[in-house]
Curated annotation (Swiss-Prot):
It comes from the Bacteria. It comes from Rickettsia typhi (strain ATCC VR-144 / Wilmington). One of its GO terms (molecular function) is Kdo transferase activity. This is 3-deoxy-D-manno-octulosonic acid transferase. InterPro entries: Glycos_transf_N, Glycos_transf_N_sf, Kdotransferase. The record marks 174, 249 as: Transition state stabilizer. Belongs to the glycosyltransferase group 1 family. Its main location: membrane. The chain crosses the membrane at residues 2-22. The gene is waaA. It is a single-pass membrane protein.
Length: 462
């Protein structure tokens, strides 16, 4: 069956090129890094490791102040530069971590931070699929790591990728199972699948292709799932050696906050009660935007901040605000909220923690149709958390936080409006305070999960 997949990957090669071209046209690919989809460019031996993207107005600069490491800054026409390093020699061990998108990328950073304490000489390669994840990594990736886009899942490109990098250990996070890269990767090094989950939709699909699923999964030396429900799904698919340690997202560090920006923002907001709508999709905004005028009519000291999951949608969101008679400004237009507006749209990466810091209540997006996003990030900031009816990608976390009276689940727009009105009502101040305190307690109580993960991973480290 794996051979059949390999053959199909050859037959469909022209289709892959078309898909990549379409993704380029709609802005989902970075033309400056498109070669990485075909495993062209960086490699492990004698390579310049891409450590960080930054903006350098000086054009070209070489810093040889430190003997161990020399850095090269290359100014690109699009104002993006690659900070490259000769820090790592071929002899150093390389741990390859695949993180599909934003949520997994945050987990990968937690793993890097803690694995390097166990193995100080290890260096890291992070692969991901989305532009959004790459932009986040450009500001957060440590010097001991580099990022590359995962190549197309075709045997030619995957073999070239693995030949270039020669990883000593591979760690796949959550649910993205590319048959070719996993099958070929297992020929080069041990592979681990951590924080694994299977959505209900994927489970139904894999039940029809159980033997193929088993062929893919057998390449992993260890499988750690994130919930009892996921363990049962793996068992039903014929995988009996998976283990459940819980969701490693509990161990993700609190989002960083620039204290100078926070002081400035807090002073500017002047004690307004802030409601943040975080990681929103169009389906969320269809519910959120119609209720804002009603909410602000009753609570004049309430200020709305919306942080879309994909900031490139900002023009569309601004247009939708106009359609609902809402005054809105984007962060790219004004660095501080316009207090006379109805809504402020944050179309910048890396500032979620800043706005959670000033929030009283946070609604977590993707929870109407996308299965929900990470609700723990807001919990670290002691926000009262609200989410929609679809938390299928975070079932156990949603169940746990609800059981601890640390969040509220709503069904629709009317339910959301009534919940916000209730929480903002001065008579319910103690109730709101309890939700906020319980959210922080919930996330702090579960942080020991990381130690259990590291205990399992440690024997596999090079």
């Amino acid at each position: 069956m794996m051979l059949l997949y390999y053959i199909l990957s050859f037959i469909l090669l022209p289709v892959y090129f078309i898909i990549i071209f379409i993704r380029l046209l709609i802005g989902k690919e970075d033309i400056r890094r498109i070669q990485e989809r075909f495993a062209i460019g960086k490699q492990r031996q004698n390579s310049l490791l891409d450590l960080q993207m930054s903006v350098n107005q000086e054009g070209f600069k070489v810093d040889t102040e430190h003997k161990a490491t020399s850095y090269v800054y290359i100014h690109r026409n699009a104002s993006l530069m690659y900070k490259l390093s000769l820090e790592r020699s071929y002899a150093q061990s390389l741990v390859w971590i695949h993180a599909a998108s934003v949520g997994e990328v945050m987990t990968s950073l937690t793993l890097i931070h803690n694995i390097c304490k166990l193995a100080p000489n290890v260096r890291f390669l992070i692969t991901s699929w989305t532009n959004t994840s790459a932009k986040i990594l450009s500001t957060k990736l440590p010097k001991i790591a580099t990022h590359q886009f995962l190549p197309i899942d075709n045997v030619i490109f995957t073999r070239k990728f693995l030949s270039n990098w020669k990883p000593d250990l591979g760690i796949f996070i959550e649910s993205e199972l590319w048959p070719c890269i996993i099958n070929e990767g297992a020929k080069h090094c041990k592979l681990l699948l951590v924080n694994a989950r299977i959505s209900n939709k994927s489970f139904k699909t894999w039940l029809k292709r159980k033997k193929f699923f088993q062929l893919i999964i057998k390449n992993f030396s260890k499988i750690i799932v994130q919930s009892e429900c996921d363990l049962q799904k793996f068992n039903a698919l014929g995988i009996s050696d998976a283990m459940n340690l819980g969701n490693i997202k509990f161990a993700n560090e609190k989002l960083l906050v620039n204290q100078e920006k926070l002081s400035k923002l807090s002073l500017h907001l002047d004690n307004r009660r802030v409601v943040v709508f975080a990681s929103t999709h169009p389906e969320d905004e269809e519910v959120i935007l119609p209720i804002i005028n009603n909410l602000k009519e009753q609570f004049v000291d309430c200020y709305i901040i919306l942080i879309p999951r994909h900031p490139e949608r900002v023009k569309s969101i601004l247009n939708n605000c106009k359609c609902h008679n809402l005054l809105a400004t984007a962060k790219s237009q004004n660095d501080l909220p316009v207090l006379s507006d109805d809504i402020y749209i944050v179309d910048r990466f890396g500032e979620m923690g800043l706005f959670f810091s000033v929030a009283t209540i946070s609604f977590i997006g993707g929870s109407f149709k996308q299965g929900g996003h990470n609700i723990l990030e807001a919990a670290y900031f002691s926000n009262c958390i609200i989410f929609g009816p679809d938390m299928s990608k975070n079932t156990d976390i949603a169940k746990g936080i609800l059981q601890n009276n640390a969040a509220i689940q709503i069904k629709n727009g009317e339910d959301l409006l009534n919940t916000l009105k209730s929480l903002l009502n001065a008579n319910n101040a103690l109730k709101l305070k309890a939700y906020r305190e319980n959210a922080l307690k919930f996330v702090e109580h579960n942080q020991k999960i990381l130690d259990e993960y590291l205990h399992v991973i440690k024997p596999f480290l090079p």
